[in-house]
Regions:
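Beta-loop-alpha module in the N-terminal Rossmann-like domain of NAD(P)-dependent dehydrogenases
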Residues: 1-39
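A general structural signal for well-ordered alpha-helical segments in protein cores
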Residues: 6, 10, 33, 60, ...
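Hydrophobic residues in well-ordered beta-strands that form the structural core
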Residues: 22, 48-50, 177
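Predominantly a Rossmann-like dinucleotide-binding segment in NAD(P)-dependent oxidoreductases
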Residues: 46, 54-134, 250
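A short glycine-threonine-serine/GTX helix/turn-capping micro-motif
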Residues: 98-104, 199-207
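Contiguous beta-strand/loop segments that form the cofactor/metal-binding neighborhood of enzyme cores
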Residues: 111-184, 203, 213-224
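Short polybasic amphipathic segments
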Residues: 166, 185-195
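C-terminal helix-rich "cap/oligomerization" subdomain common to oxidoreductases
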Residues: 217-255
Length: 255
């Protein structure tokens, strides 16, 4: 579904008594995410989760483990890039009125990943956006996120050579992910560089969509909390909104 239909159809599904695994983003903006969050209170027995499938790939568990074990010291900054080229005027990603544009489509991954790894929320956001003159969608977006103890920067684009990577820089070393967000058909390599030495870990091919579906099914069967809460989804949308606002006003936004 296009992004503008995520909220109404999720609510329709809840009204029909269905659990919902909704593709990201959970809505068009933070206001819609908040509306859904409030709506779910009427259905305490139903599970709703935003589908950020990347978090279920085993490479992320390994990276989180490296960080929690202190292998790179304290995180100082995270850098991420996610780009592809799509100039098809009929593609939903290039239609402004229904939630097209790079930030909602792929920039949300960069923001989500930074928050996930830092286990914190940014307090200040600065954004720069380039609009497509024909589609009026954001074809290029960059952001600087200031967290309490670190920073994160990202760039996403719908009209650039396809690329994705993520680096985590710490006080004692850094981690690099070569295909952080959708290594669906291939194995992938994550590396840790410290004191002039490099450790590479080859992560075997895994379908993170399947793993996500399995995890969601498990929480339904066992009546457990969903792995990615709606509070998390709302927080991510607030940062996305702040990137848009900052670019429009050409000034940082405090959260």
């Amino acid at each position: 579904l296009p992004n503008h239909l995520h909220l109404p159809w999720t609510i329709k599904a809840l009204e029909a008594g269905k659990h919902v695994l909704c593709e990201k983003p959970i809505g068009m903006n933070a206001a819609e995410a908040k509306q859904l969050f409030e709506a779910t209170k009427k259905y305490p027995d139903l599970k709703v989760m935003e589908a950020f499938m990347y978090r279920f790939h085993p490479q992320w568990k390994e990276v989180k483990s490296w960080i929690s074990e202190g292998k790179i010291g304290d995180i100082k900054t995270i850098q991420s890039v996610f780009t592809y080229f799509n100039a098809d005027p009929d593609n939903i990603r290039n239609k402004a009125g229904i939630g097209g544009g790079g930030l909602l489509d792929i920039g949300c991954y960069c923001i989500s990943a930074s928050r996930y790894l830092l286990e914190a929320e940014p307090t200040k956001v600065y954004g720069e956006i380039e609009l497509d003159p024909d589609f009026n969608t954001d074809r290029m977006a960059s952001g600087i996120l200031t967290f309490p103890k670190a920073t994160a920067t990202f760039t996403c684009s719908t009209q650039a050579s396809p690329e994705q990577h993520l680096k985590v820089f710490g006080t004692e070393g850094f981690i690099e992910m070569e295909i952080p967000f959708n290594p669906l058909e291939n194995s992938c390599t994550i590396s840790l560089k410290k004191n002039g030495e490099e450790i590479e870990s080859k992560v075997m091919q895994a379908n993170h969509y399947t793993l996500q579906g399995d995890a969601f099914s498990k929480v339904i069967l066992n009546n457990e909390p969903v792995p990615t809460s709606l509070e998390d989804a709302l927080s991510n949308m607030r940062v996305i909104d702040a990137v848009f606002e900052s670019s429009k006003n050409q000034s940082p936004v405090r959260l």
